[in-house]
């Protein structure tokens, strides 16, 4: 495993999970996903040095997520595989094609450790569920705060009202993260 801080590294902090897609008259299909995980994957596919600070288990789903990410060059930060189980987003597709979602989430990512004297990441990206779901949201905010002066900070709110809790509290978190960011999607 590596640690964040290689020159030109993109550090993405956020959820990696399994989308369980259920269609009428078909067996459920597991697909590795998560908005921040997909950003790390896209950066790696573009040839960028990408690290993902996430929270997955060592269960079969977690192993599938790790394998999926590592196949394209994404590295997980130390401690990212500490969850008791890997989170899921179950999408049930109705006969009309509309989806309904049920989330089973655990979000307690480790603070990404750095080697003494290591260069800060060029880019720090977060968003979606990771930025708002306690207790891990506090780690996300600390990472953005700590790297704000040395890295380009990118934030994608990707608002999901059903997961964000009380609107005023969620809005306050989003506003703090926007203020820490150089780029907001």
Region spans (language model):
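Short beta-strand/turn micro-motifs composed of small residues
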Residues: 14, 54-56, 157
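Conserved beta-alpha-beta core of the PfkB/ribokinase-like small-molecule kinase fold
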Residues: 123-185
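Conserved alpha-helical elements of sugar-nucleotide-dependent glycosyltransferases
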Residues: 34-35, 61, 139
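Short catalytic helix/loop segments, enriched in acidic residues and glycine
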Residues: 26-42
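Structured loop/turn residues at beta-strand edges in well-structured enzyme cores
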Residues: 5, 119, 179
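Conserved N-terminal subdomain of the carbohydrate kinase-like
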Residues: 20, 48-133, 149, 153
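Positively charged, low-complexity intrinsically disordered leader regions
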Residues: 1-23
């Amino acid at each position: 495993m590596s640690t964040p801080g290689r020159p030109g590294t993109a550090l993405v902090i956020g959820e990696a999970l399994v989308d369980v897609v259920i269609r009428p008259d078909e067996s459920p299909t597991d697909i590795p996903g998560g908005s921040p995980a997909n950003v790390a994957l896209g950066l790696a596919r573009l040839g960028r040095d990408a690290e993902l600070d996430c929270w997955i288990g060592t269960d079969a789903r977690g192993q599938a997520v790790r394998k999926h990410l590592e196949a394209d060059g994404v590295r997980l930060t130390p401690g990212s595989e500490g969850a008791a189980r890997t989170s899921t987003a179950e999408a049930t597709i109705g006969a009309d094609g509309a989806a309904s979602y049920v989330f089973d989430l655990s979000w307690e990512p480790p603070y990404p450790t750095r080697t003494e004297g290591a260069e800060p990441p060029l880019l720090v990206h977060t968003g979606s569920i990771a930025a708002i779901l306690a207790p891990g949201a506090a780690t996300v905010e600390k990472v953005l705060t700590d790297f704000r002066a040395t890295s380009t900070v990118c934030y994608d709110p990707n608002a999901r009202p059903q997961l964000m809790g009380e609107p005023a509290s969620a809005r306050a978190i989003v506003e703090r993260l926007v203020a820490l960011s150089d780029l907001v999607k």
